[in-house]
Structures are given as structure tokens and as C-alpha cells.
Amino acid sequence: MILLIDNYDSFTYNLAQYLSELNIKVLVKRNDKITLDEIKNLNIQGIIISPCPGGPEDSGISQGIIKYLGNQIPILGVCLGHQTIGHVFGGKIIKAPKLIHGKPSIIFHDGKGVFQNLKNPITATRYHSLIIEKESCPDELEITAWTEDGLIMGIQHKKYKQLQGIQFHPESILTESGKQILQNFINCLN
């Protein structure tokens, strides 16, 4: 079972639907309706932290999940979840050069983790106004995906490889290989 943290965003249920289509049982909990102790007592194999229109300060329990469980259980941060991973490890979250909402972009990647066995580049849909600043990307994190102009679109913890983030939306119909990205995350649960 996957715990899907809902940061009060409608895209959460698109993620839940995609996971269900991959035959994954999903438990959705709002970011202020579950505690770390409750999470530790659940029988889950992984956690996905959903998007949100705000910044990491709006992510509720998500920061604690990354800080205290990121070395124990596979975690995938999507959009805000991705930014929150960067923030927790000391990265600066800044305004993107351009506001991007519902726009497909060319994304280059390293072919590892959630990007395993995907063509390179892929087209992915972006909905965000914030990004992890490249210059302040923490040493603990490696950049796994990027745009043509060098904006960070994917990260992975160097030591805890199961802690990954993607800035774009795999659940968007315009994202190429979105289900495969989620399947690749599921594959790392075993």
C-alpha cells in the first residue's frame, strides 16, 4: 500500500487514479490529518507527497515525513513534494523564471530511479511557479532531470536512493510515460 499525502490539491486524486490503474492500493490522507506516529504504524511500502499551489511552508506533515522517514521508506515528491525535499535538505525555493501552468516541456534525465527505461528526453507537463534553485541544491541531493535551460526537474538523495522528487506532473495526460514513472517508483518499493 502507498500513502498519498494530499496537500489540498485536486491533482492528488489523479495520482491516486493512476496508482489504482497500476493495481496499487492507495491510502489518501490530508497533510494535517495524520501524524508521524500514525504513519509509522501503517503497513505501507512507500509514500507519495502530492502537489499544492503553495510552497513548502504549506506542506504540513510532508516536511516531517521527509526529515524523519526519508532514510527508511521510499518517498516520491511530486511538484510541491519535490520542492519540499529540496527545502528540507537546505535548498532555496525560488520563483521560476516563468510561471508554467499546464505547459508541456522537454525534460532531460539521467535514466536512473523513476526515469529508468524511459526515452530521453521526455515531454512532461508542468504546473508551477516555484523551483529549487540550482545554485543552492544541497550536496546530499543529485539532479536527475532538467529542462533545456537548466531548471531542476528531478532530484534523488545520494545516499537514500529511494528518496526522489519530480517537479512536473506524471499524472497529467500530456506527460509522456507518466504511468511508467510511477511504476518505476513502485518498482523501487521491493
UniProtKB/Swiss-Prot annotation:
Keywords: Amino-acid biosynthesis, Aromatic amino acid biosynthesis, Cyanelle, Glutamine amidotransferase, Lyase, Plastid, Tryptophan biosynthesis
Pfam families attached to this UniProt entry: GATase
InterPro entries attached to this UniProt entry: Anth_synth/Amidotransfase, Class_I_gatase-like, GATASE, TrpG/PapA_dom
Functional pathway: Amino-acid biosynthesis; L-tryptophan biosynthesis; L-tryptophan from chorismate: step 1/5
Covalent S-S links between cysteines: none
EC numbers: 4.1.3.27
Keyword Lyase in annotation: yes
Additional detail: Component I catalyzes the formation of anthranilate using ammonia rather than glutamine, whereas component II provides glutamine amidotransferase activity.
Protein name per the record: Anthranilate synthase component 2
